[in-house]
């Protein structure tokens, strides 16, 4: 973590939420001992490797994750407390973004061990349960295991707004869905 932070400082780049969420997720996992097996050290390394890659790209002015296809982790700054909050996107390779596209918002089920770092790694490595054609799938993190109430609800709404600012979303075709706790959201 120190090496990534030092790299950021040496490059004199302003961290976007897209990078800050990655670094902070590992810092939180270390601070609160959120490593539940030996294999999760590799999870932290993968998240930090992506953070370092993004720092290098940002420093060179070549951010690619904004136009990436496939599984993409992004972030935004919360109006609640100013914290960087993560979300995942699934962007089909054949997406026609010249036309307004639907947005499917998938609310995850409860996961007592799904911390920021674990959520980010899942969104970097595993597609979700739905794969609509010519549409984006949004996976908000949504703080707290409370059925997307309170801060979690605001997080979902802010994720949607952030995605609408960066992608050509058809505001008449935004679908909210989920399973278990996500279905209650």
Which residues fall in each region the model found?
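Amphipathic, heptad-repeat alpha-helical segments
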Residues: 1-23
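Sec-exported extracytoplasmic/periplasmic mature domains
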Residues: 2-9, 27-31, 35, 53-60, ...
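Solvent-exposed, acidic/flexible segments
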Residues: 12-19, 37, 41, 145-153, ...
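Solvent-exposed, polar/charged alpha-helical surfaces in well-ordered, non-transmembrane soluble domains
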Residues: 17, 24, 28, 42, ...
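A domain-start/cap signature at the N-terminus of enzymes
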Residues: 32-101
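Active-site machinery of serine-nucleophile hydrolases
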Residues: 98-167
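Residue in the alpha/beta-hydrolase core beta-strand immediately N-terminal to the catalytic nucleophile
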Residues: 173-175
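Glycine-rich nucleophile elbow surrounding the catalytic serine of serine-hydrolase chemistry
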Residues: 178-185
């Amino acid at each position: 973590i120190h090496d990534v932070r030092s790299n950021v400082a040496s490059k004199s780049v302003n961290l976007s939420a897209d990078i800050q969420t990655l670094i902070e997720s590992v810092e939180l996992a270390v601070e609160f001992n959120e490593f539940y097996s030996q294999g999760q050290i590799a999870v932290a390394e993968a998240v930090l490797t992506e953070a370092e890659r993004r720092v290098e790209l940002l420093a060179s002015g070549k951010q690619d994750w904004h136009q990436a296809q496939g599984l993409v982790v992004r972030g935004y700054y919360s109006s609640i407390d100013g914290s960087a909050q993560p979300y995942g996107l699934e962007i089909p390779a054949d997406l026609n973004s010249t036309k307004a596209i639907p947005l499917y918002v998938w609310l995850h089920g409860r996961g007592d061990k799904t911390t920021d770092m674990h959520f980010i790694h899942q969104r970097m490595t595993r597609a979700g349960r739905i794969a609509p054609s010519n549409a984006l799938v949004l996976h908000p993190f949504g703080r707290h295991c409370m059925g997307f109430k309170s801060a979690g609800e605001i997080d979902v709404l802010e994720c949607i707004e952030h995605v609408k600012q960066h992608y050509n979303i058809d505001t008449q075709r935004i679908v909210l869905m989920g399973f278990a706790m996500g279905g209650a959201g």
